[in-house]
Amino acid sequence: MRRLALEAGCAIMEIYNGPDFEVKTKSDSSPVTAADEAADTIISDGLHATFPDVTLITEEQADSHSLKSTEFFIVDPLDGTKEFVHRRGDFTINIAYVVNGIPIRGVVYAPAKHRLFYTDAQGQSLEETGPFDLEKIGTCQNISVAIPNPDGLRVVASKSHRDPTTDAYIAKYPVSDLKSAGSSLKFCLIATGEADLYPRAGRTMEWDTAAGHAVLNGAGGGVVRFDDLTPLTYGKPGYENPYFIAFAKGVSLQKP
């Protein structure tokens, strides 16, 4: 999974750093570029070749969205296409492995930010520092959530999808810092101790969250449903998520 994320990142950055690229619109009105498609081909081909018997769900292949399994890979080859299109850098490659509703392995790679996060075989999350080599793993550091300051939480929210419900929920907490970030980087900022709370009261799909969720789990954090604060699970109908809250353990979660 690490190697495929890096290979996909190389393909994405070649387009990102090149001349203007075409932006098409999918049936759900979301944007898609040649970078999404190139990364999807690299990751899909690699996973099918290595794990031919494991179901693969990927954002860019609509036919996969009706597949069902208790064990599957779920992929967003370019999470944060709007950030990519506007060359803001906050986009990621997300690859996760889900078993019985739980994302147990995940890779999140932000090629423009030179940040790479993933879980190891024991479930511990780490960040690898670049430069990144396809064959050789570089310097890695275990990551873990911070102990939140109850007098002022550090909150991270969507850069492209803010809404009144999210803002109202954030207002329930004492906040010392509020930052915006794109894509699944928000989960990783909590996982590294750079933020404490990420509420999302907007539409997301499982491929948007599974890899970041796995990384956050492996760093001691968690993700729950917004409505009843029960754990967010995967393999739901249509692979659609409810609203959710990602958090560092130690945050006293408020009900909406």
Language-model segments: what does each one mean?
Residues 1-78, 99, 164-172, 228-230, ...:
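N-terminal subdomain of lithium-sensitive/metallo-dependent phosphomonoesterases centered on the IMPase/IPPase/PAP
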Residues 26, 59, 158, 181, ...:
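Conserved beta-strand termini and adjacent loop/short-helix elements that scaffold enzyme active sites
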Residues 96-187, 232-256:
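Acidic beta-strand-loop-alpha-helix segment within the catalytic core
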Residues 67-69, 85-89, 119, 237:
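Short glycine/proline-enriched turns and hinge-like loops at secondary-structure junctions
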